[in-house]
């Protein structure tokens, strides 16, 4: 795969054999970005868990102190006063049966979904559409709730979700290159602390196996898992 000149220039600053501290890695990512748009900064973490076992699934949410820098479109399934509260909180789409039909018809212009508990029986029909995209509302992530206004405000304000995939990897964003390395680091540590808090009791050996940060168009920079926090 042929890389761009800007990518190669950024990659030259990174020692692929070196494990960096979080601050060093994020400084390299921020300084190496050269695209004409404000690149997103992503984190990939390989965990020492067995995702095939239910008691080792790592899933959670965290409110990033500096937000994500991304405009998040939130869809809410609710009726009556709850629907009105969601609209006032800034939800992009609010509805019940009509909105379910719209999504079934192929509408997917949203990034997050919230629902009141009484709507989940109907929202369950959308499992084949929302499930594979990681968009199905879930009580564990605060997206099945009676307080839809708070859920919408949290998501709009920088709340992110993460969950292990079948290879025990987590993928999530921590902001934009324009944030600068200091704010990116604060967002990174907020997410990492929550991931460490959620370490399954059944997990064996080292929990944080590999951590890589990168910008949208830049090379991956590896963070030393031991230096990431008290990793073991």
Swiss-Prot record:
A single GO BP: translation
GO CC entries: large ribosomal subunit
Example GO molecular function: tRNA binding
Cell membrane listed as a keyword: no
InterPro entries: Ribosom_uL1_bac-type (IPR005878), Ribosomal_uL1 (IPR002143), Ribosomal_uL1-like (IPR023674), Ribosomal_uL1/biogenesis (IPR028364), Ribosomal_uL1_3-a/b-sand (IPR016095), Ribosomal_uL1_CS (IPR023673)
Pfam families per record: Ribosomal_L1
Keywords assigned: Repressor, Ribonucleoprotein, Ribosomal protein, RNA-binding, rRNA-binding, Translation regulation, tRNA-binding
Self-association state and partner proteins as the record states: Part of the 50S ribosomal subunit.
PANTHER family per record: 54S RIBOSOMAL PROTEIN L1, MITOCHONDRIAL (PTHR36427), LARGE RIBOSOMAL SUBUNIT PROTEIN UL1M (PTHR36427:SF3)
Family indicated by similarity: Belongs to the universal ribosomal protein uL1 family.
Job description of the protein: Binds directly to 23S rRNA. The L1 stalk is quite mobile in the ribosome, and is involved in E site tRNA release. Protein L1 is also a translational repressor protein, it controls the translation of the L11 operon by binding to its mRNA.
HAMAP family to which the protein is assigned, alphabetical: Ribosomal_uL1_B
Name of the protein this chain belongs to: Large ribosomal subunit protein uL1
Organism encoding this protein: Cutibacterium acnes (strain DSM 16379 / KPA171202)
Taxonomic classification: Bacteria, Bacillati, Actinomycetota, Actinomycetes, Propionibacteriales
Gene name of the encoded protein: rplA
């Amino acid at each position: 795969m042929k890389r761009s000149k800007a990518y190669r220039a950024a990659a030259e600053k990174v020692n692929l054999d070196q494990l960096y501290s979080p601050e060093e890695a994020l400084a390299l990512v921020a300084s190496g970005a050269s695209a004409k748009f404000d690149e997103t900064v992503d984190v990939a973490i390989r965990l020492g868990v067995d995702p095939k076992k239910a008691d080792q699934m790592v899933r959670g949410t965290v409110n990033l102190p500096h937000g994500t820098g991304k405009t998040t479109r939130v869809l809410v399934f609710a009726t009556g006063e709850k629907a009105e509260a969601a609209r006032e909180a800034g939800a992009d789409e609010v509805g019940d049966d009509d909105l379910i039909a719209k999504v079934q018809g192929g509408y997917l212009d949203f990034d997050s979904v919230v629902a009141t508990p009484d709507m989940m029986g109907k929202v369950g029909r959308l499992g084949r559409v929302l499930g594979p995209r990681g968009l199905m509302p879930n009580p564990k992530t605060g997206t099945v709730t009676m307080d839809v206004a708070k859920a919408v405000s949290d998501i709009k304000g920088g709340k992110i979700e993460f969950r292990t995939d079948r290879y025990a990897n987590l993928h999530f964003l921590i902001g934009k290159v324009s944030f600068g390395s200091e704010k990116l680091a604060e967002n990174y540590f907020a997410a990492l602390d929550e991931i460490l808090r959620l370490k399954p009791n059944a997990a064996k050996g080292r929990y944080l196996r590999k951590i890589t940060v990168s910008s949208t168009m830049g090379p991956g920079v590896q963070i030393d898992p031991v230096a990431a926090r008290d990793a073991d």
